[in-house]
């Protein structure tokens, strides 16, 4: 048995949700309606995210990256948390419903690319098209887009101690599979609704302190 850590990015590693920031700054008002439908589970995550990004012209590529580099901030304690993970030789993956064009620049130097699982974007046409390299397997029918629960099944075994760190509806199916959940914001609401045990967190220092105890017990 080993400890396997699966961490969200938007609103978890970063202090704000980068997709939300992009939509608020660059997208037309229709984006807000689509976002509400996703959170209310009236639209699948895949359908909603696809619709959101198709609102954005591809000629905004450089502007969006520059905007996020200037405005996105990494949550306190994350760099030290990564050092702790590496020191203890723990398996750590970033799995997110966000896009390659912004996650790789923001995590450059912090997390190796091969440990990041995200959606891909096509900028070859007038509007952004989303590619879905990690779809749901036969055990999931939630049309997740990037299916976190499928990736967890692929990257770990049931004998492993699975930890999920997240903040939103996109982390719910993953949380259902976890042995331990660190949650904040809307994921706390969903954990309460589905009676999923969770530990709240504000910074990665909070998670590291809890994880230190787990490492001592599990390893």
From Swiss-Prot:
The protein's enzyme class: hydrolase
What the entry lists under SUPFAM superfamilies is as follows: HAD-like
Q: In which pathway does it act?
A: Amino-acid biosynthesis; L-methionine biosynthesis via salvage pathway; L-methionine from S-methyl-5-thio-alpha-D-ribose 1-phosphate: step 4/6
Among the GO molecular function terms of this UniProt record, one is: 2-hydroxy-3-keto-5-methylthiopentenyl-1-phosphate phosphatase activity
- Which keywords does the record carry? Amino-acid biosynthesis, Hydrolase, Methionine biosynthesis
Per the record, the GO terms for biological process are: L-methionine salvage from methylthioadenosine
Show the catalytic activity.
2-hydroxy-5-methylsulfanyl-3-oxopent-1-enyl phosphate + H2O = 1,2-dihydroxy-5-(methylsulfanyl)pent-1-en-3-one + phosphate
- Which function does this protein serve? Dephosphorylates 2-hydroxy-3-keto-5-methylthiopentenyl-1-phosphate (HK-MTPenyl-1-P) yielding 1,2-dihydroxy-3-keto-5-methylthiopentene (DHK-MTPene).
Task: List the NCBIfam families.
Answer: DKMTPPase-SF (TIGR01489), HAD-SF-IB (TIGR01488), PRK09552.1 (NF007103), salvage_mtnX (TIGR03333)
Q: What is this protein called?
A: 2-hydroxy-3-keto-5-methylthiopentenyl-1-phosphate phosphatase
Tell me the organism.
Bacillus cytotoxicus (strain DSM 22905 / CIP 110041 / 391-98 / NVH 391-98)
Q: Source organism lineage?
A: Bacteria, Bacillati, Bacillota, Bacilli, Bacillales
Gene assigned in the entry: mtnX
